Amino acid sequence: MIDRNETASEALRDWLETTLNGTDAAFEVQQQIAPRVGAHLRDDRAEVIFWTPELLEQRVPSGDVFLECLQPDSTPDLTRARQNIRFTRTWIAMDRVHDYSCVSIDGMDAGTRDRIGTFYRLAWRDAAGDWHHILDPMAWSLPFGAFAPAEFYDVEGMLAARTDGDYWTQRREDEVTKFGPPVNIQQIHVPTATAGGTLASLTALYERLAEKVAAGAELEPAEELFAGYDAVQLLPVEPTTVYEAGPAFWEEEDHGSDSLTVDLTRPDTTNWGYDVVIAGMGTVNPVLLESGRPDELLDFACALHNFPRPKKLVLDVVFGHSDNQGTNVLNSNWFAGPNMYGQNMNYRHPTVRALMLEMQRRKVNFGADGVRVDGAQDFKWWDPEVEAMRHDDEYLQSMSDIVQQVAGTSYRPWFVFEDGRPWPQEDWELSSTYRAVIEGQRDPDVFQWGPLTFAHNTPFLYGFWLSKWWRIREILNHGSNWISGCANHDTLRRGTQVDTKLNVNTRLGHTRMEILDKAYDNPAIQLVTYAAFPGVPMDFVNASARASWGFIRNQDDKYGVKVVAEEAISLKWQVDEYSYSLPQSFPRLKAMGFEDRESLVRFMEFLPALVEVTDYDLNVIAKLLSEVDPALDGPRPLSVSALKDIARAWMDDMHEYCNVARHHAGLSATQTHFNHQLREFRRDRPWLRDNLGERDRFDYRRPVDGTVLFTSLRHAPDGEQVFMVAHMEGGETGEFDPLRLPIQGLEGFGWEVALRTAQIGSDFVGGPLSLHDSMGLVYTRRPS
């Protein structure tokens, strides 16, 4: 029986009163309260605290505020697509303490891996007798997303059952351990990384890979994609936006005070992860959970940590903005006005500041070794004295300062910030130093994304490499604390949006698909990144697999057609006639009448132009498209609703098309093996992370003569030398001996070929050769 525990509720109320009435500064007070906000299992009771300033603002009497507990009459199956479940409802009176509402309750079931817990939300009654709800943004489990009641969950029991205890014990120190950077990183979007598209399926992949690595078995190309990395960085795994026009995943029919029936839909949105609503940031997006249980993120962390050579987990967190949908689930105090992504967060509000830092702490406690902060340049606040926005670097430092507790080990994770300030200022590409956070924080191992890693890099345009030479010099001199590499979720997406009329490097391939694939999985670029550049290299698995990628978000109703119009050009870069013709490709669009690629291309040629000239008037766009002669293929009649259906079909079909598992058959065994060897080469030489020293050399061959040829000579602390030569773009070099180039320190004997790109035969051990675009070599020499 669910009932209020009077003694525990009084103690909780007294603690809140004492804490709020203390003499500490406001933010320090909120930091003390934040770890207890939400619903927690305490001695078989549920302790529940909600931050509810809106109830004070609307002068809601304390007697009209309740915790609404929803106990399912039958156990929901979280693996079912849809079901109707009847819930028994219990109203428990809550206490008001300033702008908090709290209560302690007996009888609520705590969810576990094997049991569904009691669902809950705050309910309050207005003067007219109508009921309103406040959801828990600090929830531990959200099986139906951030816009539905939360599930009461035994999170301490979940964390206590982790299977990577030895990993954490080995890293325990007397005081707080500070984790450092990995040697290299693989970036993964969970929904497109495996056929299953869940954390559970990704965990299974790593567990199978671990078994083969431990046994010394030969790896398949699809397995080598994931091998040789020191760390895995997941694109954000927080709950994202929902369908703007519905349906909701939790739709209820009220039967009175005691029960309600809920039409439950398993969350099935597609999103690249960055469209967050802040609510639920401490837990996991249910779309990514095969079982619907947050334990899957814990299992994944354990699979990485238990790998034969343990891998680190890096979580990508988004606290720099909220999608506008966030205003539907959080009170107005959380926000500081609109921005280009949706809403600015109210970082200067002590409670908001404390709660967001607490969300971060909870998420990292799943067992992350590192944290990547998205869009750090967006953490700003309005300074009325100067009437300007200021960067909240104190908040960024607070993020780095959080001490985590995992399996008895106290530690501070490694941090990397994506910060391109003064972006989006017009001259940001010239003005950004990519060092603002590095130079402003206390820790010497804080990282940022480097200049070739930030979004707007397109290495398949002719002249790219020499046009970036000044940035390359910065990488060589200052790049030890930068993430390096040209292939990530942002750069690959930008590549798919490049105007096809620009001067592209046609030597990369015979078709646009080949050019794009080889631009972001390029042997020469990989050689430069892994065998020459300082910093920490990062690869995006969709690029390494030569799979597709784009802006994936199927929740929009109002602007969905506009988003697809902006993405339409990617059809020319990522989909050819053969790929489109495959039975598993674009089934929704084919069913709507776009039976072949040409019919879709023709439609997408008109759509972006009409979006622009009509100022996105969907009624006019539909009318004009209907009047095209000869008629366009697609649904008839072509209404606004049909346009939105096409946009939704595009997003869902592209999401499936981007799945890495669908591209396994096209993998080149020689290329995946070369990349794997190169990663292991870097892991065996962690000193390459350091900036170039006085004896090191990096340059391009002069005169250029139509060929950009990069050379690098690095010196290890133990005396080993690493020499690299890479053909970045242009014509054939003509025959030459790389070891006879006029580079100081290259003289003498003892050089051995360590790595060669696939086009160079394995029988090549030295001497003259001719290099073509994307070819290269690595030599090593040990001191005699």
Where are these predicted regions, by residue range?
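Carbohydrate-interacting/catalytic domains
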Residues: 1-186, 199-214, 230, 516-527, ...
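Short, solvent-exposed loop/turn and secondary-structure capping segments
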Residues: 133-136, 197-200, 243-247, 324-328, ...
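Hydrophobic faces of well-ordered beta-strands that scaffold small-molecule active sites
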Residues: 184-188, 232-234, 313-317, 371-373, ...
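The substrate-binding groove and active-site-proximal loops of carbohydrate-active enzymes
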Residues: 189-203, 275-294, 338-354, 376-393, ...
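Catalytic domains of carbohydrate-active enzymes, especially glycoside hydrolases
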Residues: 205-241, 254-274, 365-366, 370, ...
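Aromatic- and acidic-residue-enriched carbohydrate-binding clefts of CAZyme catalytic domains
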Residues: 244-295, 302, 323-351, 358-359, ...
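Active-site neighborhood of glycoside hydrolase catalytic domains
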Residues: 305, 322-433, 491
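Conserved alpha/beta catalytic core and glycan-binding cleft of carbohydrate-active enzymes
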Residues: 407-591, 599
